[in-house]
Amino acid sequence: MSKPNRFPVKRIAIDAVLIALYFGLSWASVEIAGIKLTFVGLASIIAAMVYGPIDGFLVGFLGAFCEQMLKYGFTATTLLWLLGPAMRGLVVGCAKLIFKQAMATENLLKNHRPYVFFAVSIFAGLLVSTLNTLAFYVDAKMFHYYTYELIFGVFWLRIALGAASSLLMALVTLPVLAGVQHTTLVPKKVRS
C-alpha cells in the first residue's frame, strides 16, 4: 500500500503561485526611512490558513528569499531578513492547529466573529516587525548601514504599522478563504 502524498503537485503549484504573489506584492511596498508599508504577508497567511504551518512558512521564506535576491542580493544577514516573513506563516498556521474551533474556516465565515484570527494575525505582525528590527540592528553592527536612531527611533511606529497592516491583511484573507471554500483546488479535509 502506498503512502498518501503529503505535498501533491496541485498543492505545490498553489504554493508557487502564492510565492509569486508575495514577490509581486513586495514590489508594491512603500519604504521610507526604515519603515516598510507592505502587504506581502497576505500570501503566507493564505497559505497557512488553507494548508497549514509548513506551507505558510515556506511561502513566507521563499517569497522573502526571491525579494532579497532581486532587491539586495545575498549578504551575511539574509537569513535574518527571511526569518520574519517565514515566522508569520508559521505562527498563523500553528495557531490554526491549536485553536481549531475558533480558527476553522467555516467558523470564521459563518459566525462573523474572527477575533482570534485577527489577534493571531496582529501577534504575527508584531513578531515580524520585531524580528525585522533585530535584522536592522545586526546589519547596523556588521555593515554600519543604519544608525541607532533610525533603527530604534521609529520602532514604535514600525510596530504600530505592522499591527495595522496585519489587521488589514486578515480582513482581506476572509473573502479569499470564502472563495477557496467553493473550489476544487483544496481538498475537503484541508478546508476546515
Q: Language model features by range: what are they?
A:
Residues 1-192:
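Loop-helix junctions at membrane interfaces
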